A protein has these predicted regions:
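Juxtamembrane C-cap of transmembrane helices in multi-pass membrane transport proteins
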Residues: 22-33, 38, 84-96, 104, ...
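Specific alpha-helical transmembrane segments that line the substrate/conduction pathway
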Residues: 37-48, 87-121
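Hydrophobic alpha-helical transmembrane segments of multi-pass integral membrane proteins
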Residues: 7-15, 37-52, 69, 73, ...
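Juxtamembrane helix-loop boundary signature in multi-pass membrane transporters
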Residues: 1-14, 109-169
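Hydrophobic/small/kink-forming positions within alpha-helical transmembrane segments
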Residues: 21, 25, 75-80, 84, ...
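C-terminal ends of transmembrane helices
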Residues: 50-62, 110-126, 173-185
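Membrane-interface helix termini and inter-helical loops of multi-pass transporters
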Residues: 25-33, 90-97, 143-157, 206-220
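Specific transmembrane alpha-helical segments of multi-pass solute transporters/efflux pumps
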Residues: 22-24, 57-99, 105, 141, ...
Length: 220
């Protein structure tokens, strides 16, 4: 049975967007857990789920040095740093609106296209540049009322905005590197390897931040 991915693709993106939206709501309920623990377990669970398909395609686990490099960048930025920054921004909802965090995070297509131009040699139109500028300006005014940064809460509002923007940068830039890795490999293999690498990296971050006690005891 032939699957027309051009027709199905947009619907899969819509489903993914819905899941990401739910992810943010569920993530807030895990406020008692360190962000590194959340990152570790979400990727460990994902790895366990995708493992059967990964082992089925184990013969295809041959990557060039550049592909391994791209996967490592994706794992570090998208898997670890992006999720850490996004979670940190959500924790600061006392200083910045929950919806603003999501809106800033949605700027990632701008970063995705920027890196696609640099690394994938894709071309963009002047119209795209115009709308990208409009999006950045809109994001600024959505974040800071009347265009003025309020320091009544110290610098926490600015920090929260920067964390959300950092997540957009991490996830957006990783999109281009993911695309590079997918040029010659199946999405199942690339996704499986990404989850594997991110799980290991997240565990390393857990020990770097001295939060290993929370691995088995969330209240630690």
């Amino acid at each position: 049975m032939h699957i027309n991915w051009k027709k199905i693709g947009p619907y899969l993106i819509i489903i993914a967007a819905v899941l990401w939206a739910l992810d943010g709501i569920l993530r807030r309920s895990l406020f008692s857990l360190p962000p590194t623990i959340i990152v570790f377990y979400e990727h460990l669970i994902g790895l366990i789920i995708i493992a059967p398909w990964l082992f089925k395609n184990i013969r295809n686990l041959k990557f060039t040095k550049r592909e391994w490099g791209a996967l490592l960048v994706v794992s570090i930025f998208s898997g670890v740093l992006g999720t850490l920054w996004f979670t940190t921004a959500l924790v600061k909802v006392n200083y910045i609106s929950f919806s603003v965090v999501f809106l800033l995070q949605k700027l990632q297509p701008i970063f995705a296209m920027t890196f696609a131009i640099i690394f994938l040699k894709e071309k963009i139109s002047k119209r795209y540049l115009l709308w990208a500028l409009v999006a950045m300006l809109a994001a600024y005014f959505v974040t800071f009322k009347n265009g003025l940064i309020s320091f009544n809460t110290g610098d926490e509002t600015l920090k929260a905005a920067l964390f959300a923007l950092g997540a957009a940068f991490a996830w957006g830039s990783s999109t281009a590197f993911s695309r590079f890795a997918l040029l010659r490999k199946s999405n199942t293999v690339v996704t499986g390897v990404r989850f594997f690498l991110t799980t290991i990296l997240a565990l390393i971050f857990v020990f770097i931040f001295g939060q290993q006690a929370a691995l088995m005891s969330p209240n630690s």
